[in-house]
C-alpha cells in the first residue's frame, strides 16, 4: 500500500514539476521564501558541513544551503521525482554551486546512506507527502551524526478561532482554483491542499520528533501557524 501511494504521489509531482516554483509563489503569496530565510537564520551552518536536503524538489533550499558552504562542505539533494531533479540541476548550474551540490533520486523513507553521516538534515514541505512519516524521521535520525540536527519546514494549522476558518477556506476552495487557473491542474492541487489540511499540527509534529528520539525539540511558527519550522537534535554520544 505504501509503495502504491508513493508511486502515485511521485507521479503527481512529476506532473506538476514545470509549474512548481510559480505555483508555490502564487499559493503562498511569496511567503515561503521568507519562512525559509528565517529558518536558515537559526541553523548556523559550519562552512565544511555535510548536509542532506530531503524532498529537495527544484532545489531552492539545497542551493541556499550550498551558498553557506565551502569545500569540502557539500549538500546532497534527494528527491523521488526525476523531473524535479532535472529542474534543480539547471538551477544548481545557473547559481554556480555545482561544486558543492550532488543531486540524487531516492526514497526519503529508505535513505541510501550510512549511519552517522550528516551534520544537518533539512526537509522542506515534503514530510506531509510521505506515507510513513515516522519511518522517515527514524531514517533521518539514523543518518545524522551524534549531536547533529534535523530542521523541518512544513505547512501547519493555525489554531486561533478567527484565523483557522479563513485558512481552511483558502486551502479548500482557493488553492485548487489557483491550480486550475494558473497550471490547469485542479485535481493535483486538490490533493495537495488535502495533505496540508490533514497534516499534523505543530504540537503533534514536535511529539513525532520526540518519539523518533530527537532531543531539544522546538519550533517556530509563521503566519499565525500556517507554517512552522521544527528543530531536533540527535543525542550526542
UniProtKB/Swiss-Prot annotation:
Return the protein name: Demethylmenaquinone methyltransferase
Q: What class of enzyme is it?
A: transferase
Q: Which family does it belong to?
A: Belongs to the class I-like SAM-binding methyltransferase superfamily. MenG/UbiE family.
Which gene is this protein's source? Answer: menG
List its EC numbers: 2.1.1.163
Has keyword Methyltransferase?
A: yes
Q: Which UniProt keywords apply?
A: Menaquinone biosynthesis, Methyltransferase, S-adenosyl-L-methionine, Transferase
- Describe the task this protein carries out: Methyltransferase required for the conversion of demethylmenaquinol (DMKH2) to menaquinol (MKH2).
Query: Which pathway, metabolic or otherwise, does it act in?
Result: Quinol/quinone metabolism; menaquinone biosynthesis; menaquinol from 1,4-dihydroxy-2-naphthoate: step 2/2
Q: Does the keyword Transmembrane apply?
A: no
Record field: catalytic activity: a 2-demethylmenaquinol + S-adenosyl-L-methionine = a menaquinol + S-adenosyl-L-homocysteine + H(+)
Entry's Gene Ontology BP terms: menaquinone biosynthetic process; methylation
User: PROSITE patterns from the xrefs?
Assistant: SAM_MT_UBIE, UBIE_1, UBIE_2
Q: Name one GO molecular function term.
A: demethylmenaquinone methyltransferase activity
Q: At which positions is S-adenosyl-L-methionine bound?
A: 58, 79, 107-108
